[in-house]
Amino acid sequence: IFAAGDIVGFPALASTAMEQARVAMCHAFDLKYKMQMGAVLPYGVWTVPEIATVGMGEDEARAKGVPVEIGKASFRTNPRGQIIGDTEGFVKLVFKADDKLLVGASVVGEGACELIHVPATAIHFNATLDYFIEAVFNYPSLGDAFKYAAYDGLQRLQRRVSKAMEARSRATPSIGTATPPT
């Protein structure tokens, strides 16, 4: 018995159901081409505004003990967002704090269900924030927001490191501050 779609349960999305059906058919006809689902599944809700996610969210990652940081960029400051009038949309990247490996992303706003494929591909290929910083995005495009979300993430990470170093230096007594014995 092969099953696909809503009967399988979560996530009950058309895109996932179609991939489940392809896998089921390959198993049913013993075709070796596509024998399993991909590990990275994007979720998209075609509402106004569109909402899309992939990978782990910030809370989920922390609940699993993964030390993460985020980077965000608003469509309000993105030239394409300004042109099309989407000033409420944003992209959010979730990455591991130790090696900057991308583990999740969210997009809210115009084209979110299309844009989510950029971080989905990055997660699939184990990309870090460096990918988004080094990538060249068309201008003006909403996709360019990923670059600025990566820069924001690096700034947040730097602030975290600076605070930790500052706390460590306060906890360590300075040389020469001890009172000499009398």
State each model region's role.
Residues 40-45:
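Helix-loop-beta segment of a Rossmann-like dinucleotide-binding subdomain
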Residues 1-39, 99-100:
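Rossmann-like dinucleotide/flavin-binding elements
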Residues 29-30, 34, 46-182:
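Flexible, glycine-rich terminal cap/loop adjacent to redox cofactors
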